[in-house]
Amino acid sequence: MTTLAYRRDIDGLRAIAVIAVVLFHFGVPGFTGGFVGVDIFFVISGYLITSIIWNQRQAGRFSFVDFWAGRARRILPALFVMIAAVLAVGWFLLAPKDYEELGRSVRYQVMFVSNLLFMRQDGYFDVASDLKPLLHTWSLAVEEQFYIVFPLLLILLSSRLNHWRLALFAVLLVSFGLSVWAVAHHPEKAFFLLPMRAWELLAGGMLAVAPRSQWRLTTMWAQAISLAGLALILLAVLCYDKSTPFPGAAALLPTLGVVALIRANGHQPTFVGRLLASRVLVGLGLISYSWYLWHWPVFVFANYASLDELGPFDITGLILLSLVLGYLSWRFVETPFRERRLWAGRRQILLAATCGVLVLGLAGQALRWTDGLPTRLSEQALQYAKAKEWRPELMRCLADDKTPDDQLFCHYGTPTPTVSTALVWGDSHATALIPVFDEGAHQHGVGVMLASSPGCIPVEGLEHEAQCARFNRRVEQALTRQSVGDVVLVAHWSLYLYGDVKGDLGHVLTDARGRYDRAIAEQQLAEGLQTTVRQLREGGHRVWLVKEAPLQTFSPPYRLSRLAMLHRPTDDVGLAVTEHLKRQAFISQLFTQLAQANPGVTVVDPAPVLCDEAGLCRAELGGQSLYTDTNHLSEAGARFIAPVLEPLFRRLQARAALGNGNANAAN
């Protein structure tokens, strides 16, 4: 047998995969585990690709060049058209920094390594995932890397070893072991890298090279295995969510589910197989690749351009739009190339692929050279958009494990260390306030030292990551050696209690078993902060507790820039003060209690200067965005809250005059 028989049920499986992914990405309730659709695609690809290679190998006509040309013909035309369209739409919608980042994504994707880029960008300050139009191409990069490596591995093992199937299975087990280990230690690598994903593709591959004599099942067993396979997939789609450690062992459910369905329907269709082979599912399966390509850019650009949160009707319309674009891509791009109506020869398709890589790669590089073409925007829109960018001077003050001790602190104001009488200690919200601390220190002739680490609450014992615990210990140890009288604690406090404004619970405080409970988190913060304040006071330090600025439910730079491009007013953009007070109720009560119980504790609240008498906590003032994102103040925003920090600087100034910076002066 040299030709791979077409199986309608596999196209039906593709439909299940793409539906799950699309509904998950669009936030449709009930599909919290829809991301496993990618894993379904991996297993199917592994099975089909291995079948193609092995059948041609058995027939004595396998060619690496022909194989790679076939993959290029199948994958690249639709991908390149989508990328070109995304670049065109980005011209009209994206802020310069985001357009530059899109160009970077394009460069990495045409080189088949976008998964490496997005793995590195899976950080605290990177552009939110729903603002990266090509984020979904990471899975294509994984498959493309597999297509390069796997044929070589399969041919090598099958030609050199008698028990090559066992060797291939051993590779699968090693990959699975790496995935399980990486989920616990390096989750971003587990998610994005081929070595930790290869076992899913190899699971399909092992099925393809299994001796056909082992395929036959009784009707009863085939029906049972088929039902079990579908149940495993649905269980993952409906029960998994973003908190599920993934892939690792959790990916066994969709992987084994797909293997079971392909295996059970290999010789005779089961009830589930006939369902998968239905006209609707097969039709969706046929366009699944193109639909997958288009659904994410549609969602991202809609989010980017929308001035309001997308509602159910918006979501429905966008899903249908992505489906239509997917169909058009399949009909007018995929099919002509697959049927060899365009560039039929091997040399032609490889030459066209090379040209596509060069053209798109150079276009992406040009966006880097031109800083995202800022001249596309009006001056006001550009001013708003720039607010999302952090200056390198601020980024350098974000410490991590690699930061040497002599660079743990950033110093502002009076350069003499003995006069640095205040320490600002916190997470990235402390970093965001550098402009106001820098200017205040210079204006008052005092010194300020700042230590901050992203996502690290400045309360010992509450750190959710080991590196945060190490950072806090280093700060505490340095504090005993420094001439510091005042300690200013700054953090995104509500993040650790309730998650971010979008509901991401990645940084919340949890119990000993890793479970989140709001009441327990509040109790942990209260006890931990009380202990920290007591220890600082016992060390002779005055403590300043800085409450967080009102959290916006949208990204002000994006919203304001879009409004400016549409010539619409921006003076009513912000958050209702009632919403701010509601979210901050427990934190406000806790801070007030700490201050009332100890005269050496002062509470600093930015809200009174950010919220007006009309009850609006503004996101913009004087043509400038006060925020870089939903929660970090921009440089303009940081300077705007200078009045609430004036008591701190006056105290530092008075202490410097009394004791030349002595930590115990006027304590």
Predicted regions and their residues:
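Extracellular/periplasmic envelope-modification machinery, especially enzymes
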Residues: K242, S306-G317, L323-Y327, R331, ...
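Membrane-interface helix/loop caps of multi-pass membrane proteins
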Residues: M1-W343, V359
